[in-house]
Curated annotation (Swiss-Prot):
GO terms for molecular function: mechanosensitive monoatomic ion channel activity. Signal peptide: none annotated. Belongs to the MscL family. This is Large-conductance mechanosensitive channel. The keyword Transmembrane helix applies. GO terms for cellular component: plasma membrane. InterPro entries: Mechanosensitive_channel_CS, MS_channel, MSC/AndL, MscL_channel. The chain crosses the membrane at residues 14-34, 85-105. Keywords: Cell inner membrane, Cell membrane, Ion channel, Ion transport, Membrane, Transmembrane, Transmembrane helix, Transport. Homopentamer. It is found in: Cell inner membrane. PROSITE patterns: MSCL.
């Protein structure tokens, strides 16, 4: 049983998957930072300095002594709200990650593409075969 498990783990697909998951996790951190630290501030600047990470719609009442403008504090206090700014950030992060993975898969497919098989000489056509059969039958 241990030998079978070793063979299973040593197969290329399992190791490739493990490496892909680890690299994917690290890459998600990079794209998250790109989204939050570079792209979203630019988007916010285009919309007049709006900070999307702090955009939300209150659904419940704000506890006494709390400001109704701090998303993180309200979320920590358990106030019912829709944090659409965080959602927009997550969607942009996903789109960036999906596009980069698309480019990576496209590049790998070009690199790994198998060379086309050499055109082997074509065999006789149907007409040639039928003519040969006809001639053979005439000889009999």
């Amino acid at each position: 049983m241990l030998g079978e498990f070793r063979q299973f783990i040593a197969r290329g697909n399992v190791m490739d998957l493990a490496v892909g998951v680890i690299i994917g996790g690290a890459f998600a951190t990079i794209t998250g930072s790109l989204t939050e630290d570079v792209i979203m501030p630019l988007v916010g600047a285009l919309f007049g300095g709006v900070d999307f990470s702090n955009r939300f719609i209150l659904l419940g009442s704000v506890p006494d002594g709390m400001s109704a403008t701090d998303y993180a504090a309200l979320k920590e206090a358990g106030v019912a709200m829709i944090g659409y700014g965080a959602f927009v950030t997550a969607v942009i992060n996903f789109l960036i990650l999906a596009f980069i993975i698309f480019l990576l898969v496209r590049w790998v497919n070009k690199v790994v593409r198998k060379p086309e098989a050499d055109a082997s000489p074509a065999g006789p056509s149907e007409v040639d075969l039928l003519t040969e059969i006809r001639d053979e039958l005439r000889r009999k």
